[in-house]
Amino acid sequence: MIVDRQGRRFRNLRISLTSACNYACTYCVPNGKRLVAAQDELSAEAMARGVAYLIEAAGIDRLRITGGEPLVSPKLEAFMGAVGQMGLSDISLTTNGQLLARKLPLLVDAGLKRINVSLDTLDADAFRSIARGGDLATVLDGMDQARAAGIKIKVNMVPLRGQNLDQVMPLLDYCLERGYELRFIELMRMGHLAKDSNAFLQQFVSLQQLLSLIGEHHEYLQANAPVDATAVRYEVPGKGFFGVIANESVPFCRTCSRLRLSSTGWLHGCLSSSNRHYVGDLLDQPRHQALPALQGLLMKALGDKQEVAFSGGATIMKIIGG
């Protein structure tokens, strides 16, 4: 196991199955151009081998499948079939939900138990304005079908001043009624927002601002969460839970256990670091040759982690999967 001087280790792997996405969300790709799959994306077999090697080299035991949008990838079935046999303690997936109903049989057959659905509003007009793709009713129907199939659902919402702040309470109440756990995600200084402070501040909604708004409608109590959790979690007594991933207001860098692998074979140890480490060539090598070199790169990736607080990063989130 590789541990740094802060006592941090890699435990959670987020793997971007593809950079392609069927949305073009305003806070992710401001030019409105949908991202497509990179020409040099790894195969499903190479990605699965990467997971197996990282389990052994770093002690990874939790996997989240991201994108882009993972449900648009033709690699999904083969990849999930492979990683489902690796003994991981948890496998989850983040999706925009547009293809959820269509892909649900595949996900159920693969044994998936948890999904996070990115959904920023229940208003159809605001949905079209923010996502610039897809259909709201299709997403909601997919979520209902997934819940009926026994899959646990969390909803990710990015509150944006001037765009969807009026949707905080409708979406929270919607989730509480259906047993979904809503996660508010503070806007992050990533991609174009790392360079444009004015654009960031004009849209940013803080943890305290969110709690003040929610407190006008619901009583809530802070709930327990794992030490390396990204979200500050709250309980609405008798109704359910919500969380806030408050990377600006309450940085969690000191306990971060996340490692990211892009669809093109780059390891990212920290979203706030411009450093990345190419492992694509190692994934074509036999285990006994790949592991020593991989462990060296993991040491470097762990050294990239910030000690105190997130300071932003130039990478587009869609490329490395949030």
Regions found by a protein language model. Give the residues of each.
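Canonical Radical SAM [4Fe-4S] cluster-binding loop centered on the CxxxCxxC motif
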Residues: 5-45, 58
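Glycine-centered loop/turn positions within well-structured domains
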Residues: 23, 124-125, 251, 277
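Radical SAM/AdoMet-radical enzyme domain recognition
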Residues: 44-65, 69-185
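Histidine- and/or cysteine-centered catalytic micro-motif in compact active-site loops
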Residues: 158, 185-189, 245-247
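Accessory C-terminal segments flanking Radical SAM cores
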Residues: 191-310
